[in-house]
Amino acid sequence: MIVSDTGPIVVFARIGRLSLLREVTGALLIPDAVHTEIFAKKGAMPGASEVAQATWIQRVSVVDRSIVDRMPKVLHGGEREAIALAKERGAQLLVDEIRARRAASDQGIEVIGTLRVLDEAKRLGHIGLARPIIAHMQSQGYRFERTLILSFLEIVGEG
């Protein structure tokens, strides 16, 4: 089971590859705050219509709000709720933002990111190359550290 933050879902939707996320994860849980960030924040985010049609993405409420309240305030509401939901469900967390990754790891949650999804997609034969997908994500404003990309591409044989 995987809980997702907003960023990875939206970037896969923006580049028209939301189905790739499904092929790798099977299904995703999102907390209420992530749903709100995607659909209600000053109008829907780009890619929201694709997400709305994705029946494999399930909205779930966090039960123990005290977990959310104890999260660092530098994290966005979606990140805090995603961490709390992953903790409640004993699930992996799909998130790319470094502060959220650290906070989740501090809670004992296994963290995966967009690049891990691409690695798995390549390993399973769903994509041939990760590099053009990463470039497309970057062209849509999604940021990865340059050294992280170079290291990742080396690991997946595209360096």
Residue ranges and their predicted role:
Residues M1-A91, I98, D106-I109, P132, ...:
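Active-site-proximal, substrate-binding regions of enzyme catalytic domains
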Residues V95-L115, R123:
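Mid-chain, well-packed structural core segment of small domains
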Residues G113-V156:
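Hydrophobic alpha-helical interaction segments
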